[in-house]
């Protein structure tokens, strides 16, 4: 029996259709990968099945009493609560049961023998439920999940409103896993996780007995935990049994078969039309022409989906920089307290350096310190001459009400509208996306708008903080190619070895200089 059933679903935003009469089912224990290019509607689908969005048409039916857990990175965390408090909120229904049990105990003092027996039965039922749901080992469960996702390193007594976006996501994911719902809905859970914690989450999901729906552009991760694919493309939702690689094989075969059938049909249509045109006027052949016309009219025409624009990234070079990019002398980074021991680092022209290591140890802080956005606690940074820097930040917090055209135009006022549109199209954005406000775009589309601005700026140093977060497989592959081709210097933070190992001329393990206990 289906835990979730979606029938005849259609939805769109304005004149932009997202889904057209699609169906979906989820059975107990299925591990589903929901895949598709940026902007095809994966997150929209999640919002519809969780009731955050009302579909234009169609039915969404959950089986009764099913508990659904959704990793929503926009959840507001209550000020004044510690990480531990939020994680223990996962068991709020058990604490409510304990409260109910304590109230029953209070009633026992005044109960007659018959009432007492009834109350003891009620207490027994609650006691069993608490025991079966690990109520008496909650603290150790919280500690176990917190360790697995690296929250213990941050400190469980820390106020949740002081956390970075990545740390907030970890807290929300940990709470969700502690809730153990019948269904997990995970929208890009690895975006803010480092390699160690991605590996932990991978093992957790591989052993997860219940069902989940996972959106992820990290293909090795996705492939290791799913047994079913739903592919979102051209307003359709198609089911494939197997992992991502098996899906790609079947998808390519189906695509080739459809193209061959389309070509054959187009040839037949051309021949029929030609026959009708040549023979409809003659009395002797008019009946045959009418017969061919009827065949044409009844024909189910095969339609090929319009090819989505593939991104093309070509970074504009600035003049050659000096030999030195930067050199640090006894640099100590941090805000209120040190995040590093004194650092003596040097980068020279042409180097492509990937920084890796656990979350929260100061990788982003190091980048901002090298760029001069944060003052060091101690030591100094010497920057080279003729450096033209392009900086891609991991998080952009402010709401952006510009259209994509306005956003890029504000950076390049000398461009014509045609040039702006062409630049955005080269980043894989369609006309509908280009004319939309940045605030309504998906995470991947927003990243492409930011990349568009970076690509069209003249640079000889790229500083990139997790640039692949939210990018679909095509965009990620094209970005990798463009960075390998780039003639300047690169300083890159990434949690994906599959991405950075092909680009980097050397890697720096930031765990070797952090003051954090790992």
From Swiss-Prot:
Q: Which UniProt keywords apply?
A: ATP-binding, Nucleotide-binding, Repeat, Translocase, Transport
Key word Electron transport present:
no
Ranges for domain ABC transporter: 4-260, 324-518
- Cite the binding residues for ATP: 36-43, 357-364
A Pfam family cross-referenced in the UniProt record is ABC_tran_Xtn
- Enumerate the transmembrane spans: none
* EC nos: 7.-.-.-
SUPFAM superfamilies linked: P-loop containing nucleoside triphosphate hydrolases (SSF52540)
Under the GO molecular function aspect, what terms does this record hold? ATP binding; ATP hydrolysis activity
The UniProt entry's sequence similarity note says: Belongs to the ABC transporter superfamily.
**UniProt-recorded name of the protein:** Uncharacterized ABC transporter ATP-binding protein YfmM
Which organism is this protein's natural source? Bacillus subtilis (strain 168)
